């Protein structure tokens, strides 16, 4: 088998091991046709077509669900988990049908999300705790930059403090390597839009007045915001590792953008070819792993939420506790994604004096 195809198949098997599933299971099944109507059960996935209509608070799932998971796709799924030989067609089904179901992406609209299917039901139960977090996450937007307008995700973590990735800040901040005072590039300004939702042109932009600091160890940068709207509160950071660090339900909240270096099939199917809009991207935590970061090796959180480049700086939430446990910064397709552990920042000089709460 082609090495890339093997990695896709191995990734699907690993996701299902983490989810505790077997060949007879398929996630996010919201309806089933009785087996007597065919040799294989058929599964239906909820439709998430982009629409300009608003989603009411605590919206119920759409009445119609598309697309149907075909018997061929279900058979591919079973073959994968049984470690059977896969054909080229099987690999296409894994990438275009099964992976979007295993680690889906959900729209955030009107600062909430629709009722989610059973595999993600804990997100429904934690809605009241998660909605304030949604409001504190935004899309970084530049004015006056010669090459970039949208550059990543950030979130509010202190009364006047925005956190994102250092590699994001490198695009529009000077002085990072020299040790001099940090400033925006000449003629460039930065704002954070805390809406930018699917199907809406509404925005709530916070002017970020200056870059403050970057971490020497972690892919973290701090920006200044002078005022917050009343409905946006700073997010406390977890001051210790969650009990669910290995296998716990998690979600990224951020703004995935199109990545020309990634599979178009994956992006079209998992993200529905909708980019740079606020999304809920659930998955599971997978412990700690050593990865390179700015000339060092760091022990990052591993997670398997579906992400793209615009997710740099996204908040990583433990769904069980509704706490910020990490800041997403990189990943390897069909292998793992990585986040800065929030508790490792307790004594980081970049955050000193910023009135950040660690729980």
Where are these regions (language model features)?
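Serine endopeptidase catalytic core focused on the charge-relay Asp
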Residues: 117, 129-144, 148-151, 155-309, ...
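C-terminal subregion of chymotrypsin/trypsin-like serine protease catalytic domains
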Residues: 2-25, 293-301, 308, 312, ...
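Extended hydrophobic/Leu-rich segments
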Residues: 94, 204-206, 358
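Active-site-adjacent segment of 2-oxoglutarate/Fe(II) JmjC oxygenases
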Residues: 125, 191-198, 348-359
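Protease-domain processing segments flanking chymotrypsin-fold serine proteases, especially trypsin-like
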Residues: 1-152, 279-284, 288-289
